[in-house]
């Protein structure tokens, strides 16, 4: 098989091997509305079929899907490889960490995800329960819209710098739980080119106050922060927003938190670039630092903050340079330059890289944390 790309993409191998790309039986997909025509992006209608059925060659097949409730996977009788001894998985949506903890302790479930520090502490030492810890590539960030129509005062570059200086990053890590890190910039720990962590002594309230005064707000200002009802690996975005509110009160910024459900308008406003000030999270679409380039001006996420390529053409040009660089040393240099450029400037502040904690029954083996799908069900066996 030969792939012909229309433009350079130094992350192509990472994309092809990530869980979001799957090889399907083309005949089955076409029978159910799929197409490989040039206009497939607008004419393919196989999504509804694939939401409730399988067309691949993996170890498990999808036998039941109830949105927002449950997914059932059963062993594929035609699987070509060596199978594990688990015949069926029932995946249930349960956002409450305490309920997960209790049902795991009682033996009603075998694996619990998105647990909090408190529930993990309760499970430590529990009979027949084991805990696996790790660091995800998921990040939480503050977004300040560059378009004054939506961002108001937070669209001012000096105000953005002041907010960056005022945040208590170590306190944010405490809220997110053990294992959380604060990335230096937009490239997470674990990715090629990452410059590590933002130092704790970066926070400086007096400098933040001066920056705010320089921007014309010596007495601060009031601003709405719209936040959704989502969570980041069990960490409620509303909790992060409250911490940001508390931190910014130290420099005279009065934040009014407005909570809005994702489906009730927040999601559309976020994607359409009409949110002025928010706390949000980002999960990677593939395991390569290039996925973070979408935060640059003109990128998918950049435009959600009103950050067009015209605002910072030099930084926007680094997107193309990073995509074209196939030599690892050259890629690393470009990625480091991008991180330095966004360390103190821009509408995004990465405030946390989320940890992952999985608790599971000790009767299971090989329950490990994976970047691409949290846990790999094809590796788990019953002892």
Positions of predicted regions on the chain:
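Periplasmic-binding protein-like
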Residues: 16, 151-191, 236, 342-350
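Gly/Pro-rich hinge or "lid" segments in bacterial periplasmic/extracellular proteins
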Residues: 17-83, 88
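Ligand/substrate-recognition segments at binding pockets and active sites
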Residues: 67, 213-284, 356
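Structural transition elements
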Residues: 181-214, 231-239
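Long beta-strand-rich cores associated with HINT superfamily self-processing modules
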Residues: 358-383
